[in-house]
Amino acid sequence: MAAAEVPVPSGYFTQIKEQKLKPGDLEEEKEEDGVQRVEAQEGVVKEVEAENSCLLLEARAPVESDRRILTLQTVHLESQDVHLQGLGWLSVPHSEELSGTVPEAEGILQLPSVLWLDPEPQLSLQHCVTVSIPEELYPPEELQRIHFHLLRENVLMAEENPELTPDLDESTALKKPEEDEKDQLPPQGETDKREERLLLLEMKPKEGKDDEIVLTISHLSLEEQQDPPAANQTSVPGAKAAKPKRRRQTKGKPQSFQCDTCPFTSSKLSTFNRHIKIHSNERPHLCHLCLKAFRTVTLLRNHVNTHTGTRPHKCRDCDMAFVTSGELVRHRRYKHTYEKPFKCSLCKYASVEASKMKRHIRSHTGERPFQCCQCAYASRDSYKLKRHMRTHSGEKPYECPTCHVRFTQSGTMKIHIAQKHGENVPKYECPHCATIIARKSDLRVHLRNLHSQSPEEMKCRYCPAGFHERYALIQHQRTHKNEKKFKCKQCDYACKQERCLKAHMRMHTGEKPFSCLACNKHFRQKQLLTVHLRKYHDPNFVPNLHLCLKCDKRFSRWSNLQRHRKKCDPEHETLAPNKDRRPVTRTQASEGEAGHKEGEPQCPGEQALGHQGEAAGSQSPDHGLTCEIIFNMMDK
C-alpha cells in the first residue's frame, strides 16, 4: 500500500466482547445519548497474523448457537493526507459501486479507514463493540487522537453465503484488482440490487479505563453511483488543512515530516510542529509584564528572563552567563573556541554568525536591500542604514565622558577618546604619510583605504587626472582647493565643493530632506536641523546670546554679531573670540578691560554704554526681549 502502515507485532490478541441485543434496552439507551454500550459477557479470542499489519475480524451470519463476529478491517493511512492513494479492495466476486456520505465532526480530524459488514435486520440498531488492546501496543495518550471514518470510495459488501466470506490469510491485505481481474467480476446489472448498509467507526478511550477502546458503529446513508471517484481525488469533507506530509517509512529509514510552505523536513514531530509556527502569524503566548506576544513558550520564557534578570545558561570556561543558549554558543565561539562554522564558498571568509555570512555574500552579489527613504543611500545590512539615518535626524547618541562632545557613531567616539584623551596610549605612525594613529587596528584600516593600490583608475572630480592610490587622489584634489569649479546653472553661485552646490540647489528646487522627528519640521541643511533640535527639543539648552555694545541687540551666533557690527558700528574694532572659541559678551569684555586697567576710570562713552547695558540686562521680560522672541526673530 502507498500509505505508511503501523506495525502490529504478531502474538498480540484482540478480544471481542459482545452481548446479545435487547431491542427494549437499546431503544432506551438510544433515547439518552444515541449510542448503546453493551457489556461484554462472552469473548472470542482469535490470533491474527497479518502480513500488512491490519486487523481483520471474520463475519458470519448470526446463528443462535454461534457467536456473532463482525468483519472489520482498518487501514492505517496518512493522517494529514486527504487525497487517498492506493485504496485496497476485497477479492469478492459480487460487488456494487457505492459511496458513503461522511458526517462532519467538529474539532475531530477525520482519518481514513474502510469498514464492511454483512447486512442483516439487526443492523437497524446501533451496535457497540469493545476491543481490548494492550497498553504496550497503543498507549492511552495516542488513542485519544485516533478516529476512524469512512471514505468516499468503492466498498465491497460481504454476502451471507459462507463461501463468499473472505479468508483470513488471503484477505488481510486490501488489494486493488488488476486489469485481468476486473474482467472476472460480474456486470453491475447482475448484482443483487438491494439496500446496502455501511457503517461509521469511531475510536476513543473508554470511560474510566485507559487500556480499552470503545468502537461506536453508526449507520451511513449510501447511494449508488455510476463511476466511483478516483483514488487520488478522494477527499473527506470537513477535514482540516494538511500540515505535515508524512513520508513512507521504509526499513532502516526513520519517518520524516515535510513542510508544505518551505523545503524543511524533520524526523521528529515536535520539531516539525515548532517549525510550522514560523509560517503562522499567531502569537498565543503573552508576557504578563509588558504584554508582548510570542509564538512559542521557549521565546516567552527567554523574554521573561530579561525582565527578571535570570541567566540560566552559564559558560563552563568563564563566569559569564546568558539568557538564551544561542548567546552562550556565540560567546564561546568568540572568546574560547574561536570556531567559525560559516564559510564563504566564493572566498576565504569565515564567520561565527549566519547573519554576518549573509551580509558578506551580498558583497559578492552587490545586493543592497536596505534603502534610505530620504536619499539614494543603500546598505547591505540594517545596522548601517540605522546609523545612516542619524545623518538626517541629527541624532548623536554617543558622548565623550571627558569633554562631552557628541558623536553619531561609537567607533568615532572611541577614536576621539584614544587620540585626544589617552595619556599612555601608544601612537602608531603611517610609513607613507606620517599620520599619527592611536590604535593599531585603525592603522591597518588607514593603510587599506588610503595607500592600497587599486586596479581601477580613480578620476579627479575637478579635472581629467586619474590615480590608483586614494591618498594621491586626495592630495591632488587639494590643489583645486581655491578654485570654484562648481557653478549653479540657474544663478551666479559658484563654490569649491560639490556638496555645497547640492545644498544650494535645494533653494531652487524647494527640497527639504532633513526633518525633525519631534515636530515634523523640514530643513534644507543638516546644520539648521541641528540648531533647531538644540533650541527647541533639548531641555538642557542654555542660550548664549551675543550683545551688541552699541544698540544692545542680541545674537545667538558670533558670526551674526560680527556681520551686524560692520553695519551698526563700522569704526569700532571687532572683538576676537578666545582660544576656546567662546563668544565674548559685553559683560566679559568690560570685566577684561577692568582687569587690565585697575584703578583707571572708564571713559564717558564706555561708562554710558556700561550703564545702558546693565539697564537693558535688568529689564523684565515684559519690557525687554525674551529668549522666545529672539528665537522667533531668528527663524524669520
UniProtKB/Swiss-Prot annotation:
Tissues expressing this chain: Testis-specific.
Name assigned to this protein: Transcriptional repressor CTCFL
Basic and acidic residues: compositionally biased ranges: 568-583
GO annotation terms (biological process): establishment of protein localization to chromatin; genomic imprinting; transcription initiation-coupled chromatin remodeling
Oligomer status and interactors: Interacts with histones, PRMT7 and SETD1A. Interacts (via N-terminus) with BAG6/BAT3.
Principal localisation: cytoplasm
GO CC, any one term: cytosol
Biased composition (Basic residues): 242-251
Zn finger limits (C2H2-type): 257-279, 285-307, 313-336, 342-364, 370-392, 398-421, 428-451, 458-480, 486-508, 514-537, 546-572
